[in-house]
C-alpha cells in the first residue's frame, strides 16, 4: 500500500471514531453538572467537582475563569476532550447565562451535534428555544436529555408533547423514567428492553451503582411498587402504539430528537445516554467552503477558528485560538496558509484542551478541536489550510441590545487599557464599536446583556490591572448598513439614530427603540439595514 493510501485510510478510521457535540440549555437546567458526569463516565475526571456536598471537592472542571468560580455560572465556552470505548469525544461546553448567546452561537458553528438539556419541572424555557433556533438554522441533530427526574416535575408524556408542538420535532424516547421525585427508581432502556435501577451514591460524585433487570423478570416486583410498575407499563404501551419509530436519517436531518430521562446530579441515566448518543450521533460531516463541500476525509488539512481566549493561563498571559479541524490530518509544527492574510503560519505548540488544562498534542483529525498559540494572527472565523486555497463560511455577529462607553480614568494605564480592549475584542468577549466623532475616542461596548459589561470590567481589572468605568448610552438596537459608507452618504442626513463604526470599520446605526428604526426605514427606503453583521471574511480588523 502506498504512503498516500495509508494516510487516507488512517484519516478515514480516525473520523469514524470522532464525535463532537455542544450542550444547550437555559441557565440552571444542570448543564455544568451533566458535563461533569459525562467526563466522570468517560474517565476524564475521577470525582465530579460540581457537587458542593463537601468543601474539599474541586470547583466544576469546565468553569475555569475566576469570575465563573466566584458566581457559580458559566460565562465562556470551553472545550473538553475525552475518550470512551474507542471514541474520541469533543464536548463543547457553552455559556449557561443568557447574556452569552453570541459565544454560544460561535461554539455551535464548530459542533456536529447538539444536546438539548431540559429541566423536568420547567420544560422548554426561553434560552433553550432561542438556542434551538440557532441549531435548526445550522441543521444540527438534536438529542434531548430531560434532567432532574429525582425532583418533582411534569409528566414525561406532557414534556414529549411540548417538544413536538412547540419545536416541531418528532420525538423518540430512548429510555423511559420509572417514578419521579423521591419515588424515582431508574429508567427503562427501550434499546436493551431492560430496567436500570439506580442507587444514590456520594451525591453523584462517583459512577452510580446499578442493577439491570430484563422486562418480564419476576424480580421486578421486589424492586418496584405495584402502582409505579403499572404506570410504567401503561406509559410504555402508549409509546409503542402511538409514538414514532426511531429514524436516524430524520435525527441527522434535525427533524427528530431522541429523548433520554435522568438525573445528572445523582447519575441516573447518564451512562445510558452517553452510550446511545455515541451510536446515534452524526460523525464529522462535509462543510461548505469557497470551493464547495469539503469532506473530513479529504487528505489535506484545513480548519477554522471559532473562538479566541486571552489569559487562559494567568501565569503566562497567553492567547489561544480554538480551531475546529475540518479535513485531513493536523500535525505538530506543520506550516499552513492563513486564508484571510495569505501569510504562512507555523503551528508550533498545539494543545489538547481540557477547560484551562492543556497538554501538547502531536496530531488531530476532522471533528477534533485544538488550541493554537495566537500571537495576534488569528481572528474569529479565520480559515487555515494546506494545499489548494479554500475558505469556510465566516461566523456572523448578532445585534447587541445594550451600549456603553468604557472609560479609563487613569492615563498612566493607557497601554494596558488598549491591550485589554484589543485582546477582548479579538476574543469576541464583547462587540466593540467607536464613535465617528474623532473627539470621542473611548470604545463603545456593545453587549447582549448587562453581565457582559461586568465581565469586561472584571477581566480588565484582574487580567490587565485597569480599573474602568461605564457611561451608558440610551440605545437598544443596532443595524449594519449594507453597501457601507457610500450607501450612507447617498442617504444624506438621518434622524432618530447615531452612526458608529464596528470592529471592521463598517457603519452601524444605533437606535433608541423600534419606533426610531421603523421611522428611518420609512424615511430612507433605499437603505438596506441588517440585524446580523456581514461576515468579515478577507478583511482586517481596524
Swiss-Prot record:
Main location: cytoplasm
SUPFAM superfamilies, alphabetized: EF-G C-terminal domain-like, P-loop containing nucleoside triphosphate hydrolases, Translation proteins
Keywords annotated in UniProt: Cytoplasm, GTP-binding, Nucleotide-binding, Protein biosynthesis
Biological process annotations from GO: regulation of translational termination
MF annotations from Gene Ontology: GTP binding; GTPase activity; translation release factor activity, codon nonspecific; translation release factor activity, codon specific
Signal sequence extent: none
Domain tr-type G: 16-285
Location of the protein in the cell: Cytoplasm
UniProt cross-references to CDD domains, sorted A to Z: RF3, RF3_II
Family matches, as InterPro entries: EF-G-like_DII (IPR053905), EFG_III/V (IPR035647), G_TR_CS (IPR031157), P-loop_NTPase (IPR027417), PrfC (IPR004548), RF3_C (IPR032090), RF3_dom_3_sf (IPR038467), RF3_GTP-bd (IPR041732)
Similarity field: Belongs to the TRAFAC class translation factor GTPase superfamily. Classic translation factor GTPase family. PrfC subfamily.
PANTHER family for the chain: PEPTIDE CHAIN RELEASE FACTOR RF3
NCBIfam families: prfC, PRK00741.1, small_GTP
UniProt protein name: Peptide chain release factor 3
Classification of source organism: Bacteria, Bacillati, Cyanobacteriota, Cyanophyceae, Oscillatoriophycideae
Gene responsible for this protein: prfC
